[in-house]
Amino acid sequence: MTNATHETGADTVEYIGVDMAKARFEWGVHGARSTRGASNDPAGFEALLADLRERRVGLIVIEATGGLEHALASVLLQLGLPVAVVNPRAAREFARSMGHLAKTDAIDALALAHYAHTLAHKANQAGVLFSPVPAHLEALQAMVLRRKQLMDMRTAETNRRGGPMRVLRKSIDAVIKTLNKQIDALDKDIGAHLEQHFKELDKRFEDIKGIGPNTCAAVVAFMPELGQIKGGRAAKLVGLAPLNNDSGTLRGKRSTWGGRSIVRSALYMATLSAVRFNPVIKVFYLRLLAAGKPKKVALTACSHKLLRILNAMARSGQAWNPEIHGFTA
């Protein structure tokens, strides 16, 4: 699109939205009607920076796009510009609430600029600002995500194996065998990485019955806030905090949703083991069932408790102790 025609004074604080794609990105200014675009590379970054140098920037919001946003966000941060990388679902829901029902790169960029204006006026603005991920943590995140991809592929191939075309089984079995080797190799790499960079935390977490290497890796990789935030906040980030659904005199059923699915899934698998072998979680689970809670609700509550225990251990540096952590709410 053409250059924005939005005119501002020299002292006007402006809010920028950036919509990222693999090859290009589009940016817009809150209150403008048009956007600009550039290639997603250093030359394109310089085009954006040239525009920003003419402005007094209050906040730049970039939609998280599978890591495509990291390079630009890091460049902006190094130059001292305030940057927030936001959840795509939150950004889209905000856009719809503002009446942006259609979806194009330009519309998204302007909607993100509007979102930047809103976020900048929140009391806890510091909580949304981007901070670069350390290289060793970024590497662990990449390995954990890759393992999930391989596991999903293996599940898909296993399901295909049960199909009616027996002539395909040899091919499917060969793919499964290759995937098994890839997963085993990646498990060793993840274990070595945890040993090198997260040894103490890894040991503390894996001392908890139910928490294995894969759960530990997912939690360490995608919950770096553990130990620095309250348990309730951790539960909200993962999507394990029951959220109210009330309106007027209606008191709806509370439910959990959203959050970091890769951590939530890992904790759920750990919970299935913990309700059998971890004395603290087992007693808690049985008490919930005795109180009439459905199994799914009880399991979710156990995952919530397990996360709070991990958060408390990360904060205190204490080893797993059933007598202490059994009272963690």
Language-model features, listed with the residues they occupy:
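Charged substrate- and nucleic-acid-binding regions of tRNA-handling and nucleotidyl-transfer enzymes
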Residues: 290-323
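Gly/Thr-rich phosphate-binding beta-strand-loop-beta motif of the actin/hexokinase/Hsp70
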Residues: 6-30, 112, 150, 217
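Phosphate-backbone recognition surface of nucleic-acid-processing proteins
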Residues: 213, 217-291, 295, 322-329
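Short glycine-rich phosphate-binding loop at a beta-alpha junction
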Residues: 57-68
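Long, charge-rich intrinsically disordered scaffolds of nucleic-acid metabolism proteins
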Residues: 2, 74-77, 84-209, 217
